[in-house]
């Protein structure tokens, strides 16, 4: 009986200590994925002003941005059976905004952020191409329909994207959206 209690206590202690493993000091956030530990390092804290993402301590992504992280609305990821992140949408905010066009009413329009989808479901991480909503240049992620073969990503401006085989393509630019999705 005492031996069972000791084993249960040791299992509890090891589980709790693993769950509260600290992020490195220069990382802004850490997450556990199907392939291991993910660390976000924002460019504003780096001498070269480049944001980075590390997987198990190895750099897998770098961008000219001052901030990087998981999309915060709660739909930007899907978990595997062990409750680790399997697919994830990452946003990053550019160091230098990107000129898009001049609008007669609003003047010059700029893009401040972009997105990529990270897929940890295979033996190696797959990082999608860069994508962003075109109709409203500061639209946030609204919802994601995660699937085994493909996923649909929708933004607040009504634009929709499809992720399949490591690539994201726009399937609706949001300009003709009259449904309840555009609010």
Predicted features along the sequence, with ranges:
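Beta-propeller blade signature
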Residues: 106-122
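A short beta-strand motif characteristic of beta-propeller blades
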Residues: 61-67, 127-130
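Short beta-strand elements that form the blades of beta-propeller/WD-repeat-like
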Residues: 34-44, 85-109, 148-156
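Repetitive beta-architecture junctions, highlighting loop-to-beta-strand starts
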Residues: 48-51, 113-115
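Signature of short aromatic-glycine-proline-rich micro-motifs recurring in repeat-based ectodomains
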Residues: 70-79, 156-158
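Acidic, small-residue rich beta-repeat scaffolds with periodic aromatic anchors
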Residues: 5, 18-50, 57, 120-183
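N-terminal signal peptide c-region/cleavage motif recognized by signal peptidases
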Residues: 14-16
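Sec-dependent signal peptide recognition
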Residues: 2-12
């Amino acid at each position: 009986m005492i031996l069972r209690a000791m084993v249960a206590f040791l299992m509890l202690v090891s589980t709790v200590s693993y769950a509260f493993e600290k992020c490195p000091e220069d990382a802004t956030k850490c997450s556990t994925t199907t392939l291991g530990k993910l660390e976000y390092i924002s460019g504003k804290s780096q001498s070269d002003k480049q944001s980075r993402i590390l997987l198990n301590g190895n750099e897998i992504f770098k961008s000219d941005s001052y901030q990087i992280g998981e999309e915060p609305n709660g739909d930007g990821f899907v978990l595997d059976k062990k409750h680790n992140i399997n697919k994830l949408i990452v946003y990053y905010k550019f160091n230098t905004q990107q000129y898009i066009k001049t609008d007669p009413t609003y003047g010059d329009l700029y893009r401040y952020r972009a997105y990529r989808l990270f897929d940890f479901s295979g033996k190696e991480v797959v990082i999608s191409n860069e994508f962003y909503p075109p109709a409203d240049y500061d639209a946030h992620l609204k919802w994601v329909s995660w699937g085994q073969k493909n996923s649909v990503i929708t933004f607040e401006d009504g634009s929709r994207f499809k992720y399949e085989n490591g690539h994201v393509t726009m399937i609706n630019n949001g300009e003709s959206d009259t449904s309840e999705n555009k609010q």
